[in-house]
Regions:
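Glycine-rich phosphate-binding loops that contact phosphosugars or nucleotide phosphates
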Residues: 294-439, 443-446, 526-567, 571, ...
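Generic C-terminus detector
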Residues: 258, 549, 562-564, 574-615
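Acidic/histidine-rich
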Residues: 156-190, 464, 469-495, 537
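Glycine-rich oxoanion-binding loops at beta->alpha junctions
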Residues: 67, 71-84, 275, 280-293, ...
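Conserved short alpha-helical segments that host acidic/polar catalytic motifs at enzyme active sites
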Residues: 1-255, 267-300, 339, 434, ...
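Active-site phosphate/pyrophosphate-binding segments
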Residues: 265-269, 273-303, 383, 393-522, ...
Length: 615
């Protein structure tokens, strides 16, 4: 949520900041703003809407020169989306400018105290409170910017990633983070600040990811100093070499990032198991698992914590771990887990799943699990993310940057990683026979080919999308391994097309949802030959008898469901446990085409953010 971009160096800042904000659009936002400093004057432009609206506003209102700049895309938390509430915010004196991602929980008493001291507020935001608090600290004790920020942040309760500029000391930007990500790109005679590395990847491959509770004094022509916010202690930061490249974060000829990412799934699944899966040798080697194998094998249970699509991947993993490795599994919404005083101990293994590695609720769940003595294993996509650093060990999905807000390739690569972990544990425990274990390795190795074949359903998905694009409601049904796929299919549709959709276990249809079925209700049924096929056929017959419109995802060559369904989409035959990797593909394509036909913003759906970094 929200995006931060900053630049201090020798180049013109405006194009760097604007391009950077566009690269962060996937994070979700409702307004944008920029501040430029030309050596004398701070020039600010803000606009409700898109970065393109900001560009128009900036050209009308300010001169766009200056080698220092900060920019922001805002996702409203305090105050409605409008120009006034957009960032950057200036202090009362006009000397300080700030951009902020996060929530200041104690902003109300801080604001009241500042009002008592004569401060006047222009916006409804918590961020304006913070910049004036910094100014008050700075004036009261005659402090330099860095020290004033440090003192002020010790009075703040909440989460933040900030960049602060002081025109009285114009060769410096101060950045700090707690609970929200912040990366600093290091170039020759220049620095870049951003919520992630995508805004500066074309300028430098070296970056420092600030840890929670750290701040950086970024000075032009001087080395950067990183300190602890709590006690001002110096920190020696690790400079990382970035793994992504510019090509990965461009559309590459596709109309939308989401479509590109759907079609990347054969290659990224292969990247996920590359070097880990050795089918011919009967081996799975994952360093994070091997180094902590006894922790997994001695666990009384596995607790999976995640949000959104990652939670659905966790549900698939629940079936896989229990069937393959015979370890009890509980799957928890991270947002609920942390607030219900869960019973956790040192015999538990907690697996935290997050594409971005920055999900606030998942981070909080990790910290709680660690406090209670559990071993915590992370499954993330973004290298160097907060969750990857906070967990005891983990595995990256290697899916590459996922820009579309609605996750696609993150889902299938998460399932791939979790399947490999379950297979490795099954081998160690002897809970799968030698032949069954090898058959799964061999099938997993050819899953990219089957995904590629499933992508050939695109034209069929487009035809069906044209029929149901105006449906007000949809129902998704699946059983066993494909119940989470039904949930994920419904989520994708509602996320990007704004059609109300619900996912249910097919057996639960008779316990309520069947009351909704009539000739106006499209029902998407995941019905592969494996698993509970006869049961799902019975469910389809029940829908048919109530005149529901049936769209079924079936195994290639199926005849029984073909006779009952109004529309079918055929996918290649796959074992029950691996079928979610295949059956989810046509549902992704259906959602995509319906959203496009409805004129929706596929990559940046309304009210949604890619990385939910606030609670």
């Amino acid at each position: 949520m929200c995006g931060i971009v900053g630049y201090i160096g020798y180049r013109e800042a405006y194009p760097i900041v604007i391009k950077g904000l566009k690269r962060l659009e996937y994070r979700g936002y409702d307004s944008a703003g920029v501040m430029l400093f030309d050596g004398k004057t701070m020039k600010v432009a803000k606009a409700k809407g898109k970065v393109s609206d900001l560009e128009e506003r900036a050209l009308q209102q300010i001169t766009i020169n200056g080698t220092i700049g900060i920019g922001h895309t805002r996702w409203a938390t305090h105050g409605v989306p409008n120009d006034v509430n957009s960032h950057p915010h200036l202090s009362n004196s006009g000397d300080l400018a700030i951009i902020h991602n996060g929530i200041i929980e104690n902003y109300a008493p801080l604001k009241a105290e500042l009002i008592n001291r004569g401060y006047v507020f222009q916006s409804d935001t918590d961020t304006e409170v913070l910049v004036n608090l910094i100014e008050e600290v700075q004036k009261k004790d005659n402090l330099k910017l860095g020290k004033a920020v440090q003192v002020a942040l010790n009075q703040v309760v909440g989460a933040y990633a900030i960049a602060v500029f002081d025109k009285k000391n114009p060769n410096e930007i101060v950045a700090a983070r707690l609970g929200s990500p912040l990366a600093i790109g290091i170039g020759e005679g220049e620095y870049f600040i951003a919520s992630d590395a995508s805004p500066f990847i074309e300028y430098t491959s070296n970056a420092v990811y600030l840890e929670d509770g750290e701040m950086a004094n970024i000075r032009l022509h001087k080395s950067m100093k990183v300190r602890k916010i709590k006690d001002d202690a110096l920190v020696n930061p690790t400079i990382q070499e970035l793994q992504m490249n510019l090509e990965q974060i461009e559309k590459g000829g596709y109309d939308h990032f989401m479509l590109k990412e759907i079609y990347e799934q054969p290659s990224v699944i292969k990247d996920t198991y590359r070097g880990r899966l050795h089918a011919n040798d009967g081996l799975i080697q994952m360093a994070g698992v091997e180094d902590n194998l006894e922790k997994f094998l001695n666990a009384d249970r596995i607790i999976i914590v995640a949000c959104g699509t990652s939670w659905h991947a966790g549900l698939v993993a629940e079936y896989i771990f229990e069937e393959f490795a015979r370890i009890p599994v509980e799957v928890e919404y991270a947002s609920e887990f942390r607030y219900r005083n869960p019973i956790i101990n040192s015999k538990d293994v907690v697996i935290a799943i997050s594409q971005s590695g920055e999900t606030a609720d998942t981070m909080a769940a990790i910290k709680l699990a660690k406090e209670k003595g559990a071993f915590v294993f992370g499954v993330c996509n973004v290298v160097g993310s907060s969750i990857s650093r906070e967990t005891h060990a983990g595995a990256y999905t290697h899916a590459g940057p996922e820009i579309g807000v609605a996750s696609t390739k993150a889902f299938t690569t998460q399932i791939t990683v979790l399947t490999m972990i379950a297979l490795r544990l099954a081998k160690a425990k002897g809970t799968l026979s030698h032949s069954v274990f090898h058959s799964y390795l061999q099938e997993l190795e050819i899953i990219p080919d089957k995904v590629r074949e499933a992508l050939e359903t695109n034209d069929r998905a487009k035809e069906i999308a044209a029929v149901f694009k105006d449906a007000p409601n949809c129902l998704y049904l699946g059983r066993g391994y494909n119940f989470p796929v039904a949930l994920e299919g419904a989520l994708k549709l509602k996320e990007i097309s704004y059609i109300h959709a619900e996912g249910y276990p097919a057996a639960e249809m008779k316990h309520g949802p069947i009351a909704l079925i009539d000739e106006q209700m499209p029902v998407f049924v995941i019905a592969p030959k494996q698993g509970h096929y006869d049961k799902i056929v019975s469910n389809i017959q029940e829908i048919k008898s109530r005149s529901g419109k049936i769209i079924a995802v079936v195994t290639k060559g199926d005849t029984q469901v073909r006779e009952l369904a109004d529309y079918i989409i055929e996918v290649p035959e796959t074992s029950d446990a691996l079928s979610p990797l295949i059956t989810t593909i046509p549902l992704q394509l259906l959602s995509y085409h319906i959203a496009v036909m409805r004129g929706c913003n596929v990559d940046q759906p309304r009210n949604l953010a890619k990385s939910v970094t606030v609670e």
